[in-house]
């Protein structure tokens, strides 16, 4: 979820003990901020909540300032510029400063929550890049056929285009594109669409596959990829050979930590050690990773939404990462009849 967001709203409690608990080493709040930054969410708003429950005085400016200072310090270490992060004192329970300015905190002169949200810069949608559309689902619709569904992350999808699906290399023509039951001339980044493809069985395309333009840097399967990874929670040490599940865009596939190349300083990114024997909670590292099954990923620089991932094991997020480079497999996939017609290949 975090990897799809344009802005992060970090909610921290202001009540006595509540903030300390949430913001402790064991608390989730720090992890949420780190996760957001690592996964490319560059805009942050902090809501300091439960202002109606501060002690000894309700709606305490002193408590607000104390929390703002501590959270700012942490956000700076993560990589955010606290000067650019609005801190809004709110009460979700009482409704203070959510959509209307509260008379309980006359000392606060900044934007209220809804204004801070309205002030977010919409990110530039990369429609000039080649098409990448990770599939969320594939439906079989009577009388229409196979309809893959997903969000256009980069580029443009149009009827008549011959798309290539990675990691299989399957090529076929797009007959039509729909969003919310309306036919589109073209779909652009951010659009959640369904598109109809001919001569393709539901078994051939799956969630986690990526549609791309067969004529413009088509997506391919990754033999391996190099990633910068931050370990958030692991009870022991992570050795080469560790194979947890990696969630990247809509794909959910076990990947092996094949080679631990370097251990890094988490804040500066400088190398601390080559070929470490293991890494543990709190470490950052450059790792060569190998998918256990065919998988399509991209470097973060070229295609950000396909270049960041979460590592999951033991029902929690063990690590997050950003892909630096991909070693691609040359795909020799099936070309359907409609693709041959559309491209004039016999």
Curated annotation (Swiss-Prot):
The protein's matches in InterPro entries, at most eight in alphabetical order, are given as:
EFTu-like_2, GTP-eEF1A_C, P-loop_NTPase, T_Tr_GTP-bd_dom, TRAFAC_GTPase_members, Transl_B-barrel_sf, Transl_elong_EF1A/Init_IF2_C
Keyword ATP-binding carried by entry: no
Indicate the segments forming the tr-type G domain, all copies: 1-127
Q: Where in the cell is it found?
A: Cytoplasm
Q: Name one GO molecular function term.
A: GTPase activity
Residues annotated to bind GTP = 49-52
Q: Where are the transmembrane segments?
A: none
Q: Which SUPFAM superfamilies match?
A: EF-Tu/eEF-1alpha/eIF2-gamma C-terminal domain (SSF50465), P-loop containing nucleoside triphosphate hydrolases (SSF52540), Translation proteins (SSF50447)
Show the Gene3D superfamilies listed in the entry. P-loop containing nucleotide triphosphate hydrolases, Translation factors
**Can you say what this protein is called?**
Elongation factor 1-alpha
Per the UniProt record, the source organism is Eimeria bovis
């Amino acid at each position: 979820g975090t990897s799809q967001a344009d802005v992060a709203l970090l909610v921290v409690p202001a009540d006595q003990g509540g903030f300390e608990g949430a913001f402790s080493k064991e608390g989730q709040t720090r992890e949420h901020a780190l996760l957001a930054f690592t996964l490319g969410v560059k805009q942050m708003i902090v809501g300091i909540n439960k202002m109606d429950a501060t002690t000894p005085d309700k709606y305490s400016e002193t408590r607000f300032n104390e929390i703002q200072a501590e959270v700012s310090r942490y956000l700076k270490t993560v990589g955010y510029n606290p000067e650019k992060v609005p801190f809004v004192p709110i009460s979700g329970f009482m409704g203070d400063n959510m959509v209307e300015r509260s008379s309980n905190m006359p000392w606060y002169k900044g934007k209220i929550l809804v204004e801070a949200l309205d002030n977010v810069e919409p990110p530039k949608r990369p429609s000039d890049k080649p098409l990448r559309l990770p599939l969320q689902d594939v439906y079989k619709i009577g009388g229409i056929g196979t309809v893959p569904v997903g969000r256009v992350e980069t580029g443009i999808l149009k009827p008549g285009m011959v798309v290539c699906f990675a990691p299989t290399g399957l090529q076929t023509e797009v007959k039509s594109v729909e969003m919310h039951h309306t036919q589109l001339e073209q779909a652009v980044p951010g659009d959640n669409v369904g598109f109809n493809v001919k001569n393709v069985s539901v078994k051939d395309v799956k969630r986690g596959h990526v549609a791309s333009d067969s004529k413009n840097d088509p997506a391919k399967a990754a033999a391996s990829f190099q990633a910068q990874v931050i370990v958030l929670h692991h009870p022991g040490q992570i050795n080469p050979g560790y194979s947890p599940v990696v969630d990247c865009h809509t794909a959910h596939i076990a990947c092996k930590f094949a080679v631990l190349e370097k251990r890094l300083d988490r804040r500066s990114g400088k190398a601390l050690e080559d070929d470490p024997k293991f890494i543990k909670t709190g470490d950052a590292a450059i790792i060569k990773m190998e998918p256990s099954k065919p998988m399509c990923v991209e470097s973060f620089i070229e295609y950000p939404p396909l270049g960041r991932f979460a590592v999951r094991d033991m029902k929690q997020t063990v690590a997050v990462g950003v892909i630096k480079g991909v070693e691609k497999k040359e795909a020799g996939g099936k070309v359907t009849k409609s693709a041959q017609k559309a491209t004039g290949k016999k």
